[in-house]
Amino acid sequence: MAGSGVAKQIFALDFEIFGRVQGVFFRKHTSHEAKRLGVRGWCMNTRDGTVKGQLEAPMMNLMEMKHWLENNRIPNAKVSKAEFSQIQEIEDYTFTSFDIKH
């Protein structure tokens, strides 16, 4: 029976990471981790020296990525603060992969 699988609930949140997160390959590592976890969305450097972005994934994957953003072990990076929007359920993905915006 085709299509008999249960659809996964998808959730989304926005993030902004503060600290020493530019010039230390933070976006590259974030993209790699998101792809490893099956998280879709994007990240980019801001003019204020932060990295911000959006995440979309099933809840467990989203929470793993959120934890990674707060506690990563990227050489030379130092997160001083991580801000996240409220998690919202969405009907379907709006991104097809995880991208680094320039």
Swiss-Prot record:
GO cellular component: cytoplasm
Name of a matching Pfam family: Acylphosphatase
S-S pairs: none
Acylphosphatase-like domain span: 12-102
Reactions this protein catalyses: an acyl phosphate + H2O = a carboxylate + phosphate + H(+)
Record key words, sorted: Hydrolase
Active-site residue list: 27, 45
GO molecular function per UniProt: acylphosphatase activity; hydrolase activity
EC number: 3.6.1.7
Keyword Hydrolase set for record: yes
UniProt note: pH dependence: Optimum pH is 4.8-5.8.
UniProt cross-references to PANTHER family, sorted A to Z: ACYLPHOSPHATASE, ACYLPHOSPHATASE-RELATED
Family classification: Belongs to the acylphosphatase family.
Name under which the protein is recorded: Acylphosphatase-2
Organism: Drosophila melanogaster
